[in-house]
Amino acid sequence: ERLRAVQDRRAAMFRILESTGTIELRSLVEGGESFDSCAMDLWRQGDEFALRLRKFGERFLWIGSDGRDWWVFELTGEPTRLVVMPLDRGLPTDLPLEESLLGPRKLLEIAGLMPFGDRLRVDGPELAEDGLLRLETRGSGEGGWHRLRWTIEPRRMLPVAVEALDDQGRCVVRSSLREYEPIAARDQPVGDWPQFPGKVLIRDATGETDVRIYFNRPNARGGRIKPALFDLERLIETFKPERVEHRLDRVPSTPP
């Protein structure tokens, strides 16, 4: 229960989050390897999320969510494209894996920034031979992420790795979380600032896709966060995508 309380409190402070940094995207493609190094800006406010990537100063990719839907603006292709999807549905198969790994829920899960809450499995953490704790939680289900296996450093109670598992218990994606430092958080004194991983390394099980995130001066205060970052209509006016794909078939729900 103490481990749950520590992670849940830490994750709650990250519901407001902003950072600059660098993202490196590597993937094997026919005939060789694709590599992109991008400047990053990330903003999160509750369930709202925005991630901007720039390459050589030009817009490259914008991923965002208003808490109900999420979207990807692909800004360098011909034609430029916007894909809009509901958060409660699986991922389209034509979306590149490196883009789907940067989606709001997946990124927060694999970076160890989500609470355990009631998702923690009842068999609880196990102490492995390497002295680290292992535990499992339910995953979002997106893209086959049915469970998450966490590796926790017990002294500081911080996740150092997260694995996304499919419905057969096979690892789909694995992350390594490194270089923790305390970051400023809203309404928290310096001594209570939460620990945040400065480096998140993500690799899929095939080894064909690799995403490396290097955060620069992250904070949980939210001083630069503005509503327009999460407003899809305003983003469309700004980016003017040449092709728009709405994939909004939703899980049926009972009307209020």
Where are these regions (language model features)?
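An acidic-aromatic
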Residues: 44-106
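Extended beta-strand-rich segments in extracellular/periplasmic secretory proteins, especially
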Residues: 108-199
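Beta-strand-dominated lipid-handling architectures at cellular/organellar boundaries
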Residues: 20-22, 33-39, 43-48, 158-161, ...
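Edge/loop elements at the starts and ends of beta-strands within beta-rich repeat scaffolds
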Residues: 9-17, 32-35, 42-47, 63-65, ...
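Non-transmembrane domains of secretory- and envelope-associated proteins
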Residues: 129-131, 166-256
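A short, surface-exposed beta-strand/turn
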Residues: 44, 65, 146-164, 214-226
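A mature extracytoplasmic/lumenal domain signature
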Residues: 23, 53-57, 67, 76-77, ...
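N-terminal leader/targeting segments and the immediate start of mature chains
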Residues: 1-39, 95-98, 126, 244-256
